[in-house]
A protein has these predicted regions:
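Alpha/beta-hydrolase-fold catalytic nucleophile elbow
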Residues: 17-20, 71, 104-105
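Core-facing hydrophobic residues within beta-strands of well-ordered domains
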Residues: 13-14, 65, 99
Length: 137
């Protein structure tokens, strides 16, 4: 939902920061579980997935030069790195967007303190939120 809102309102977004974020509805929570949030059946969501799936809605963000930072563990089985932050990183860079992906080794989808006390993420948000940051884009 975060990426969808940002893609529809890029002029209101300074940056996107995520801790093991869901970026691919097919991967998690799965179309059958995601469909009700979009007021659709699973088959309707599958047919219209390109309109709602964050990995398919990156172009407006790249065009607006919105920087992205994710921290995502390499052994996350709930929201797999490769199918979520990994795809976002690859596609966003191909669109010319700037993204930093930090991958802590041996971490999954858990409450590891390093996710929530990541100095790089905090610094990224503070820097990106500065009023004059828009001129840097």
């Amino acid at each position: 939902m975060l990426y969808n809102w940002a893609a529809e309102n890029p002029e209101k977004v300074k940056c996107i920061a995520g801790i093991y974020p869901v970026c691919n509805l097919s991967s998690y929570p799965g179309l059958n579980r995601a469909a009700p949030a979009y007021k659709m059946t699973e088959s309707e969501l599958e047919k219209n997935l390109h309109l709602h799936n964050p990995i398919d809605k990156l172009k407006p963000l790249a065009e607006a030069r919105i920087p992205i930072f994710h921290i995502h563990g390499n052994v996350d089985r709930v929201v797999p790195l490769k199918l979520n932050s990994g795809i976002i990183s690859k596609r966003y860079k191909l669109l010319g967007g700037k993204m930093q992906l930090t991958v802590p080794e041996g971490q999954g989808h858990n409450m590891w303190e390093g996710f929530f006390k990541c100095k790089e993420l905090v610094d990224f948000v503070i820097y990106s939120s500065k009023e004059n940051f828009n001129s840097d884009r």
